[in-house]
């Protein structure tokens, strides 16, 4: 059968991986797809590298706009990244009636609503398995595998850099700054790591999963985002003593009031499978009302793991590209006319449990004052450690886990506790999820 | 849009779950599928229970053959189980041009080749996500999510009963017989547990995954099957001391010589995520050449988890049922004309590592004799425990882990070791997989 022709935009890490996996496994992929999938043209600014990688097996150009207008191209694979030129290219490809496969989470999180509307109007597919959690087929699981369910929540370790850093901080008892340098040396963190360590990358991915899970429009601009750069190794240790592990989770949850959409360091019980996802690995835990909890685990980044997702999309599009649009899986899992506009909840309205660490003067009555304030806000305490002060030390630390409460209540309590004479310095507040 | 009409065969546990999840989440499912999915007729021998469960919302009958011939039925859902009447019904439904959704692993493992050929000829779909690992969308992951990959191997905990029993044996230090009775009391094991505890159920599921992974025809009749009924609690303890956990794994692996297809108790390193899958949960670890290892975890049985998979298939079939067959995902992942016939390897040719436990007379020279025999077969030792004999005891135990070797070599060595004067009783031999 006639091969399908792919125009590849960008042959960096993921583009290079896609090119080489297609070459290596092309025969087996064709046996699955029903026809060969071939890269017919590659656009990249670095023509010399592009020629070296493609070895005359296809055309090369430095003009990406020529590729999205090329009449011989059936599917455009956008692996340039960023959300300016990439957006123009994707919209132009759609306008030209091309199907698009992309790994660009920033683009979809910010401009997905516009892009999917354009694709819908033109009757083309925009596939994006590679945009979330690399090679793990989590988009497929959410959009197709769990269609029977009312999805209740999703909690994911969806940034390998931060998970690597947290694993190392715990294992070796080192500080964030020291481990970040090590991660940069090993290539697990970028020279400018802000995007990863401050949780922005995770929030992009979370926004995409949230839209698909709830049939809601993409709401990245309303996500609450906290990273791990302020996390103290002492809190990782105390959490362990209490039976918890700290992970940077992306959490989205449907409540009767709206949708929670938040990325922040989170205590989770050590006995949960997801608490044991170590190093640069990714995992997504999904709670559906019928299936219960399911978990998806694998490499969330890297050339070939991400290429695995790009090519899975290519096979899907190859199978479906001549079919009526009605036969295809909707871009955001729900039919375009069946999307809803659920409000994203402000963090003050989120209900969860909390870990608090207070530095206090070592004298009687302090604990009574603190617990009185918590009780006034109807916050009850689940567990507590009071560190024994060392010989001659006049201050000590109290660590508490609370039961569930609304974030505005804990914040009100913290303000009052911080104003107590006996309380010294800032109060550490981390969120805790049981994930049951 | 016009609803799609489902004929449900069997309204027991899974049928009842399917009926009630469709009722509860029908509106949300229609928003995904693009049209309502409604059960229009249910066939079950127990008419009274059927009427009670369906509450006049659809027709009921005790004649399943009438349903598969019913012109108003678009999709037949077969949840009767077994492989005699169910086979006739499925083949009849296909002959009548109906699409089929089934959870029947025994039927597909034994008669899948015939059923898929009939469906292919007639241009209908046979969907079977629910046949493997309950609500975990593992069939979709293998058939669609990982299409870029040359799949190297799959290792799965795909029987909840046995995983529950092994978890309890380890946690509580109890024997198989005691825990089995407890599992039966809790409803985790059938009154006749043979099918589960002897590994047959796991082998059915493994055969289906193996065919999909490698594009091979269904080869259940050649699977090697060992259960857990002979497993001694002592070996679970020794394995723990050595850093391993014992799980009943279904393993299928592509080698240059053929396909390994085997179910047996297996030692796996405790630090692997899959080693920490406890109780009745299921998990499948898949190694692809591009994506690396990915893991899928969730409930492998039960009314609603299995219904989740049945209904996901119903949504897929609903979307695709008027599309050209060429647009659909092939039944066994590879196009029918691109299937191969890889040989299934006899166990003697399988290469893996081993755990050995020997009861020996407590005297010098025994260990030298044993290691000499292993060396003669080119088997090297990775770790060893020699239990200190108690005061006055004349026998002791030696536990060894070997490096990889061919099964015929270890068996030859065991025969020679067993004939040594100093070796008392049977030698325990378990297989060990690193799963990397």
PLM segments and residue spans:
Chain A
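N-terminal glycine-/serine-/threonine-rich beta1-alpha1-beta2 phosphate-ribose binding loop
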Residues: 1-96
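Rossmann-like NAD(P)H-binding beta-loop-alpha module
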Residues: 120-201, 208
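Low-complexity, glycine/alanine/valine/leucine- and proline-rich hydrophobic stretches
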Residues: 264-289, 303-304, 375-393
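Rossmann-fold NAD(P)-binding glycine/threonine-rich loop
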Residues: 85-96, 105-143
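A conserved regulatory-domain signal marking ACT and ACT-like small-molecule sensing domains
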Residues: 309, 314, 318-436
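Short, ordered loop/turn segments at secondary-structure junctions
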Residues: 45-47, 65, 105-107, 113, ...
């Amino acid at each position: 059968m006639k091969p399908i022709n792919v125009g590849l935009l960008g042959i960096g890490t993921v583009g290079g991986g896609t090119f080489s996996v297609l070459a290596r496994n092309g025969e087996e992929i064709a046996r699955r797809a029903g026809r060969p999938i071939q890269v017919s043209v590659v656009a990249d600014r670095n023509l010399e590298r592009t020629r070296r990688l493609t070895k005359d097996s296809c055309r090369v150009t430095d003009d990406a706009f020529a590729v999205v207008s090329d009449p011989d191209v059936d599917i455009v694979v956008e692996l340039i990244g960023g959300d300016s030129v990439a957006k123009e290219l994707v919209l132009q490809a759609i306008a030209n009636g091309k199907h698009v496969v992309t790994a660009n989470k920033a683009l979809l999180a910010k401009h997905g609503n516009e892009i999917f509307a354009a694709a819908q109007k033109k009757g083309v597919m925009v596939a994006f398995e590679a945009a979330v959690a690399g090679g793990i087929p989590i988009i497929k699981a959410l959009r197709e595998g769990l269609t029977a369910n009312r999805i209740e929540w999703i909690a994911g370790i969806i940034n390998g850099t931060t998970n690597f850093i947290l694993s190392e901080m715990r294992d070796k008892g080192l500080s964030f700054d020291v481990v970040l340098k090590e991660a940069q040396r090993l290539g697990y963190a970028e020279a400018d790591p802000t995007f990863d360590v401050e949780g922005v990358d995770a929030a992009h991915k979370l926004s995409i999963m949230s839209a698909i899970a709830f049939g809601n429009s993409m709401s990245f601009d309303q996500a609450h985002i906290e990273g791990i750069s302020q996390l103290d190794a002492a809190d990782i240790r105390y959490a362990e003593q209490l039976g918890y592990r700290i992970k940077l989770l992306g959490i989205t949850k449907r409540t009767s009031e709206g949708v929670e959409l938040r990325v922040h360091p989170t205590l989770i019980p050590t006995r949960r499978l997801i608490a044991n996802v170590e190093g640069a690995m990714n995992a997504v835990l999904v709670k559906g009302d019928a299936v219960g909890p399911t978990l998806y685990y694998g490499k969330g980044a890297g050339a070939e793991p991400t290429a695995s997702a790009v090519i899975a999309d290519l096979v899907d599009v190859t199978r479906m590209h001549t079919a009526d649009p009605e036969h295809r899986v909707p871009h955001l899992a729900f039919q375009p006319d069946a999307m809803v506009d659920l409000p994203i909840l402000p963090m003050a309205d989120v209900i969860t449990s909390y870990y608090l660490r207070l530095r206090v003067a070592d004298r009687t009555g302090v604990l009574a004052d603190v617990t009185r304030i918590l009780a006034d806000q109807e916050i009850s305490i689940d567990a507590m450690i009071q560190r024994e002060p060392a010989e001659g030390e006049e201050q000590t630390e109290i660590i508490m886990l609370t039961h569930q409460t609304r974030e505005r209540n804990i914040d009100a309590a913290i303000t009052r506790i911080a104003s107590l004479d006996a309380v010294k310095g800032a109060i550490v507040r981390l969120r805790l999820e049981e994930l049951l």
